[in-house]
């Protein structure tokens, strides 16, 4: 990383740490005054169906204190199906819903079943880094549900994004081809470690969101409280995210996406999480807030206090980039003059 960029990042982190020490207090005062305090729960609950309460009730949740956001997302991507892809036959008997709530609805609702099958197909194509053709997705949906394909594709895309942090993007409208793109650059296609597994990007974005909303620094207790709402427990291997403690305190820390440190002067020792340098480099507060908003089926500005901070962060990034470009241009001009001067003396 260039020296100028490092110094800019260091300066921004110092400002964030200073701001974070007072943000919880300031946020409480602001939200108490405006009566818009948001007591949030995990936006990503893995279960059997996508549950959604009325829009009116969701709006009221943002206005009343001590109320969690009304909209939660539950995704069941269980499957047991053989199908033919572009050039290969993929046979799978696996379930993402082990130990979760009942999948009775997913077994009786044909649209949910087709959505789950399409999610499995998309995940296989993502792991193999193969292009995705609309014709192949239609084979998964089959003729009986061809008319429902747009709705099924929309739901499958949503599930891929909020659970795994992977976006489905159309790359060629003439050939109806798509590609899956991770929201961040975690190694091994998002699985972090080599071998079998699923992308951890969605979980990382959730953790970054908690840290941001807790004043840019979240205690370990608050992180586990949040993860428990996602049915992810300390010491219990998760069917998608693996061993959670190792993932969040070792793997993501080693990769510099998270910082895990002891709370100053704590006795007995307590620990807290912050954004790591790679998180600052690969995403932003606004992008994380947009992710949370999408999961909760709302808009970033619904999180008013954090939205305003995210806007300030975006402005700081633009200014830092402009300063870096100005510095690079000045250095380039200086080098050009030096070369011209040496040539004239030759």
Curated annotation (Swiss-Prot):
Biased amino acid composition, Polar residues: 18-33
Taxonomy, superkingdom: Eukaryota
GO terms under cellular component: nucleus
InterPro entries, alphabetized: MAGE, MAGE_N, MAGE_WH1, MAGE_WH2, MHD_dom
Descriptive protein name: Melanoma-associated antigen B3
Gene that produces this protein: MAGEB3
One Pfam family of this chain: MAGE
Entry comment describing in which tissues the protein is expressed: Expressed in testis.
Domain MAGE: 111-310
């Amino acid at each position: 990383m260039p020296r100028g960029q490092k110094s800019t990042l260091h300066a921004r982190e110092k400002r964030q740490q200073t701001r974070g020490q007072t943000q919880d207090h300031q946020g409480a005062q602001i939200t108490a005054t405006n009566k818009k305090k948001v007591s949030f729960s995990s936006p990503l609950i893995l279960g059997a169906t996508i549950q959604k309460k009325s829009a009116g009730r969701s709006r009221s949740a943002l206005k009343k204190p001590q109320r969690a956001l009304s909209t939660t997302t539950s995704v069941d991507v269980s499957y047991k199906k053989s199908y033919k892809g572009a050039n290969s036959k993929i046979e799978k008997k696996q379930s993402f819903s082990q130990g979760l709530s009942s999948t009775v609805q997913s077994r009786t609702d044909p649209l949910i079943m087709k959505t789950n099958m399409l999610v499995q197909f998309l995940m296989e194509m993502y792991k193999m880094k193969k292009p995705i053709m609309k014709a192949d997705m239609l084979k998964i949906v089959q003729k009986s549900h061809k008319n429902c394909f747009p709705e099924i594709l929309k739901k499958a895309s949503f599930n891929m994004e909020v659970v795994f942090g992977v976006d489905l993007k159309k790359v060629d409208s003439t050939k109806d081809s798509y590609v899956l793109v991770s929201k961040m650059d975690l190694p091994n296609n998002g699985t972090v470690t080599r071998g079998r597994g699923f992308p951890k990007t969605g979980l990382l974005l959730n953790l970054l969101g908690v840290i941001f909303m807790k004043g840019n620094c979240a205690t370990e207790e608050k992180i586990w409280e949040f993860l428990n709402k996602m049915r992810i427990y300390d010491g219990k291997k998760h069917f998608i995210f693996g061993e959670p403690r190792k993932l969040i305190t070792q793997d993501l820390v080693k990769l510099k996406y998270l910082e895990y440190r002891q709370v100053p002067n704590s006795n007995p020792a307590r620990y807290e999480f912050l954004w790591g340098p790679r998180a600052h480099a690969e995403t932003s507060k606004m992008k994380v807030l947009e992710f949370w908003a999408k999961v909760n089926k709302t808009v970033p500005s619904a999180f008013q206090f954090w939205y305003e901070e995210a806007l300030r962060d975006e402005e700081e990034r633009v200014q830092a980039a402009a300063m870096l470009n100005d510095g690079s241009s000045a250095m380039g001009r200086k080098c050009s003059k030096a070369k011209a001067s040496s040539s004239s003396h030759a």
